[in-house]
Amino acid sequence: MTILTHTLGFPRVGLRRELKKAQESYWAGNATREELLAVGRELRARHWQQQKQAGIDLLPVGDFAWYDHVLTTSLLLGNVPARHQNNDGSVDIDTLFRIGRGRAPTGEPAAAAEMTKWFNTNYHYMVPEFSKGQQFRLTWTQLLEEVDEALALGHKIKPVLLGPVTYLWLGKVKGEPFDRLTLLKDILPVYQHVLAELAKRGIEWVQIDEPALVLELPQAWLDAFKLAYDALAGQVKLLLTTYFEGVTPNLNTIIALPVQGLHVDLIHGKDDVSELHQRLPADWLLSAGLINGRNVWRADLPEKYAQINDIVGKRALWVSSSCSLLHSPIDLSVETRLDAEVKSWFAFALQKCGELALLRDALNSGDTAAVTEWSAPIQARRHSTRVHNVGVEKRLAAITAQDSQRENPYEVRAEAQRARFKLPAWPTTTIGSFPQTTEIRGLRLDFKKGNLDANHYRTGIAEHIRQAIIEQERLGLDVLVHGEAERNDMVEYFGEHLDGFVFTQNGWVQSYGSRCVKPPVVIGDISRPAPITVEWAKYAQSLTDKPVKGMLTGPVTILCWSFPREDVTRETIAKQIALALRDEVADLEAAGIGIIQIDEPALREGLPLRRSDWDAYLAWGVEAFRINAAAAKDETQIHTHMCYCEFNDIMDSIAALDADVITIETSRSDMELLESFEAFDYPNEIGPGVYDIHSPNVPSVEWIEALLKKAAQRIPAQRLWVNPDCGLKTRGWPETRAALANMVKAAHNLRQAE
């Protein structure tokens, strides 16, 4: 039985972020719909050809998405919220963008769908909305059109579909409460229709993604898989695809399904290959996810060979990435500035395809010479002085419980802070960043390219900071920020100033919609050679009598939004970062900065997928934050910010952070996230976000007042702050001014009403 290679998906954005640029040009009215669609066709054709040339036997089709693949599935099923629907019920690409960006067909503002993290990754999806009695029908044929494209190009393909049970699991009920699982029988006919259309096209295998099968699911949801796949069986061969964890706990459910193959993630799961082989039906294909789709490290191919070789020839076998390569940059070969030694440690999406081909050839032939040669740099790295820093390791080993304790409890600190800052009721602030204008980005780019000397660069950044302070004082905000003009990304900026990180030129990965990030890579022990934020924070504070927040990205977020080392634990990395940033807190405080924000938007996303594994993660995640913050004196107010979060199940840990103020993203959920804080009786101060910064819509004063009044029904008004949902980096100045003016006005109105 010959082993084949396949991938579960490939990066969509293009090596030069062509998709992002085309989307934003279209949204700005500078490109036609056909021009946008042409970019998509070009990218798909290029990516299929690149994978094929790299050695992939069966190409994924349907992994491309204009915004995210869950939203694509919603359109496929005709699941369009009423506020975004065309009058005639038709669906087009503008419908998709309206759901993601918040517009009605008339062009008027309409709340965007809620956005949240895709399992425990830094990718996002638009949450499907379900209502009682909802109808579904095939309305969006993107998958079928792309299958036709790939077949016309002569490729051997494997269409990709998000499975029906996972799709329902990822959604939320809107309106009258009901069990959304009851909709399964209503969406299955659409899936049957799609599979029938694929069968007509001669498709043999369909990859149907059910990552919910790695979770600890209620029994009713486990039972739903049998109902679903009994209905879907028979038209094509189904490769039931899981990832991000192992399947062994739910294997009894899986082996009862009428599918023809199973993909398992052998990187992030603890499944034993021999046990899987013994328990799976003998005629099933096993797709082994042996190459990490979520990191950038070169694979130890001899180890992968040994992991799978015992079952070669005993059952049908494919080798694949652990998950979609969506989470990896595209091509290492264009990284011309990386040090040669460090570069030899990495593999991006195309190189991972090559690794799969090497592994396939070795398994088919029994000749391991090529895989051994490929993995030689891994052995060298284990002894590199660039990886190990004895001073950092000693400091980490010396941590005591006292290092994670503030001097006094919140009640004592709050009194000292009130006396120091004398803020009004309903204090107003922003989350940190202001619009990153073309001028700001150009300034940074010119400096990075060497076209601008340091003095001119610093003068330019100082002027943008000065303007940000002027804007905030003009608006009447109470606690100011410097605007972060010097920062391209909240994680990359800190990584650039910490030892132990390296950066790529083109290592972009998609976060959501058109937003891409370029995560740093943790290659060694982490330390802070010099202060990072102090100079600009001190300068901003010198321009105003109002408090200016120092802005730090927290240790867990830096960890989660970087590509981490794989030779030490995530806990070790987080605590190394915490110690480095603890010194930054002390330096900011010494420079006269009285309010310091330590952003931890990724705390929840780092949770293991199985609840039984949560406690250990939360214990070290909270400890890392507290180590970072505990250098602050009582009168220094520590803020933290979180977004895209469901807090109900981690409230103990949120409280254990012991931040003086937490700001959270709540506007898209209509303040429902505050229910968690109310039920828990959260003791510290809270800033519930009052408008959605991911949408260009400007909220009215009345809208903001209504949200704040709703918040005050759950949290005492004296402990409430007023702020946007998130940073304003991606917005333009006109809507930023308008939105903040309305926010400040709403706060003033509420003060006057008291």
Curated annotation (Swiss-Prot):
Substrates-to-products reaction catalysed: 5-methyltetrahydropteroyltri-L-glutamate + L-homocysteine = tetrahydropteroyltri-L-glutamate + L-methionine
Sites where the protein binds L-methionine: 431-433, 484, 599
Intrachain S-S bonds: none
Alphabetical UniProt keywords: Amino-acid biosynthesis, Metal-binding, Methionine biosynthesis, Methyltransferase, Repeat, Transferase, Zinc
Record: active site: 694
GO biological process: methionine biosynthetic process; methylation
Pathway this chain belongs to: Amino-acid biosynthesis; L-methionine biosynthesis via de novo pathway; L-methionine from L-homocysteine (MetE route): step 1/1
Gene3D superfamilies recorded: 3.20.20.210
Residues reported to bind Zn(2+): 641, 643, 665, 726
Pfam family, one: Meth_synt_2
EC number: 2.1.1.14
Annotated positions binding L-homocysteine: 431-433, 484, 599
InterPro entries: Cbl-indep_Met_Synth_N, Cobalamin-indep_Met_synthase, Met_Synth_C/arc, UROD/MetE-like_sf
Residues noted as binding 5-methyltetrahydropteroyltri-L-glutamate in the record, renumbered to the chain: 17-20, 117, 515-516, 561, 605
Manner of cofactor binding, per the entry note: Binds 1 zinc ion per subunit.
Cofactor: Zn(2+)
Recorded family membership: Belongs to the vitamin-B12 independent methionine synthase family.
Function: Catalyzes the transfer of a methyl group from 5-methyltetrahydrofolate to homocysteine resulting in methionine formation.
Annotated NCBIfam families: met_syn_B12ind, PRK05222.1
Name of the protein described by the UniProt record: 5-methyltetrahydropteroyltriglutamate--homocysteine methyltransferase
Classification of source organism: Bacteria, Pseudomonadati, Pseudomonadota, Gammaproteobacteria, Enterobacterales
Gene for this chain: metE
